[in-house]
Amino acid sequence: MASLIQVRDLLALRGRMEATQISQTLNTPQPMINAMLQQLESMGKAVRIQEEPDGCLSGSCKSCPEGKACLREWWALR
């Protein structure tokens, strides 16, 4: 099980990562990582970066039947 400090350190080393990547790297359940990232965000230590729909290569994200599931969410240190 990872600690909040390990999540912060991993973000410091890698720059920016998705929550799923952090979960796999630290071998920690996804809901736990999500909670830790939200805690870091509320403390002002991490920031959530969401891709814009214009970044979609096919240009069809706005009408995506999966509800914009193709848009990625990254985390980085502040």
Swiss-Prot record:
UniProt keywords, alphabetically: DNA-binding, Iron, Iron-sulfur, Metal-binding, Repressor, Transcription, Transcription regulation
Any GO molecular function: iron-sulfur cluster binding
Gene3D superfamilies: Winged helix-like DNA-binding domain superfamily/Winged helix DNA-binding domain
Binding annotation for iron-sulfur cluster: 56, 61, 64, 70
InterPro entries linked: FeoC, Tscrpt_reg_HTH_FeoC, WH-like_DNA-bd_sf, WH_DNA-bd_sf
SUPFAM superfamilies tied to this protein: Winged helix' DNA-binding domain
Family from the record: Belongs to the FeoC family.
Function: May function as a transcriptional regulator that controls feoABC expression.
Protein name from the UniProt record: Probable [Fe-S]-dependent transcriptional repressor
Source species of the chain: Shigella sonnei (strain Ss046)
